[in-house]
Amino acid sequence: MYKRQAKYYSNLEFDLKEGKRGSRYIHVEEILKEITEAESALVVNNNAGAVLISLNTLAYKKEVIVSRGELVEIGGSFRIPEVMKWAGCILKEVGTTNKTHLFDYENAITENTALLLKVHKSNFEITGFTKEVSVEELVKLGKKVGLPVMKDLGSGCFIDFSKYGLKKEPTVQEVLKAGVDIVTFSGDKLLGGPQAGIILGKKEFIEKIKRNPLNRALRIDKLTLAGLEATLRLYRDEILAIEHLPILKMILISKEELKKKARYLYKKLKELKLKDFEFKIIETISKTGGGALPTLDLTSYAIAVNSRFSPQTIQKALRENEPPIITRIEENKLLIDVRCLFAVSYTHLTLPTKA
């Protein structure tokens, strides 16, 4: 599909059935509604854009109430308070860094309040003496006072990882079922598609967001739409999604499969017959990275490399490999974690031979 859209004609904004101008969003809107049971959907170019346009539409020049402990910063130093400022909203933070109660939200509501916002801490976690208000509690308050509730999931996911023995991560479906009016999340990261910002929720609010002039500036292009549509189609069958989407496959790969990969890489490295290197298969811990699942430890296998060359020198050589192999250094040893290596990574391995 992706290659076809790139090479040939596309019905991006042409309704083939009616023979007139159509909507570019229809290509993914129906699938998103089918998978998540959302009333309506809109896709923009990234999640920061999704948050920006949602806030600008629902709360321009009005107050948005959010917990102090949820004023997150994502990659590149982009912060929720700054996104809110550029959306033209008035930030009203409540609670403390570690504890926010329902009464904090309720006591902060004024005639100028337009939105209750909850932000998922997708790239960090606060532990210890903590308290946060659940989505369900906030939705109940929103209904009581007549205010919409928005949830920014950040790296949203469609699959319940706890079914596979991993730590629970809120799914998009669960958040919608809790009754939020708007939920925003990324099309890449845990979803495994191209970069995009997905907005789901109540039709009355999504329709307002669609009419916002910012939608034109943030709109998604045809190649991204094609890639996202192909990704979403896989989610009609969870097993198919896990089998074909690299991010899901890498997170959920079995320990036995990882050990097989490690043995194969060890064999390929030994075949190089390098005098100044020693290789050893060790057990290690993988992290997901990419602003998702910050506290999840995934048991993995790696090749530990010892050599007269410094770990930094070996690391640089592998980065310049074709294709590049990304490694890490622990306790002055170079580790090649096999979890994220594709089969093509083994075809040509380059290690330093001269100082």
Residue ranges and their predicted role:
Residues K3-S23:
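Active-site cofactor/substrate anionic-group-binding motifs, chiefly glycine-
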Residues L16-Y235, K270:
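Conserved PLP-enzyme active-site core in the AAT-like
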Residues A6-Y9, R216, E320-I326:
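A common structural junction motif
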